[in-house]
């Protein structure tokens, strides 16, 4: 098993248990205690976990902004699976809004070099990777959020308002039981709302860690979008 796969599995376990011993992780990840300790040291450096004597606890990321570099490492295998299926929904010649979420960032890996699409994004990471693939991309500009490398604010919103996309792909931090999609970042929520208003079809990408959670700022409700793709069955819910 590769290191990233082990770390992803450890995070899966901690999302369920919150705390686990080294011996427990070694048994369920099928790796030695030495390997587990090495992985946990790396995960602690990334701000994903807190190590303690003989065990580890999942870092509490509720109600605070989590930097993109940390979100990129969290549940990466699941995000890649969702991203791969999301990309399969894109038709040639489409114009697409992509937000700055880590799940959407994974989508770029599955786009072909020189694919015949046009992307509008407020994410510098997304824009840079698309340029490397020689895919047409518009970056909205605006005030840069260092932790997320996304552009926000009125300049960004004005550009989004001036454009129309066939598709929008986005994620957020929470999907409550009553269908509210929400996030802790006010500025990124505003960007997503603008994109939602100017896209013909909207896709919400959601893994199980987001289910049952609610944050301060509401992006939209599931009744406001056309499709959402979620972990496990990847069920597509049509409005």
Identify the residue ranges that each predicted region occupies.
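HTH-adjacent hinge/linker in prokaryotic transcriptional regulators
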Residues: 2-29, 34-100, 108-116, 120, ...
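Generic beta-structure capping elements
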Residues: 59-61, 101, 140, 172-173
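Conserved SAM/SAH-binding loop
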Residues: 104
């Amino acid at each position: 098993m590769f290191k990233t796969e082990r770390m992803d599995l450890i995070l899966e376990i901690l999302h369920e248990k919150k705390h686990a011993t080294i011996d427990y992780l070694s048994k369920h990840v099928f790796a030695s205690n030495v390997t587990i300790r090495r992985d946990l040291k790396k995960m602690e450096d990334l701000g994903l976990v807190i190590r303690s004597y003989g065990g580890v606890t999942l870092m509490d990321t509720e109600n605070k902004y989590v930097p993109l570099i940390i979100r990129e490492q969290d549940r990466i295998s699941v995000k890649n699976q969702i991203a791969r299926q999301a990309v399969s929904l894109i038709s040639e010649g489409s114009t697409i809004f992509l937000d700055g979420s880590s799940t959407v960032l994974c989508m770029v890996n599955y786009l072909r070099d020189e694919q015949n699409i046009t992307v509008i994004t407020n994410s510098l990471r997304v824009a840079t990777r698309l340029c490397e693939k020689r895919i047409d991309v518009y970056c909205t500009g605006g005030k840069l959020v260092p932790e997320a490398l996304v552009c926000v604010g009125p300049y960004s919103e004005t550009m989004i308002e001036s454009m129309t996309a066939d598709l929008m792909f986005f994620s957020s931090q929470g999907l409550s039981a009553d269908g509210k999609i929400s996030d802790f970042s006010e500025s990124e929520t505003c960007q997503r709302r603008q994109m939602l208003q100017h896209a013909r079809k909207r896709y919400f990408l959601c893994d199980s860690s987001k289910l049952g959670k609610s944050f301060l700022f509401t992006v939209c409700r599931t009744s406001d979008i056309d499709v959402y793709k979620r972990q496990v069955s990847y069920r597509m819910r049509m409005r």
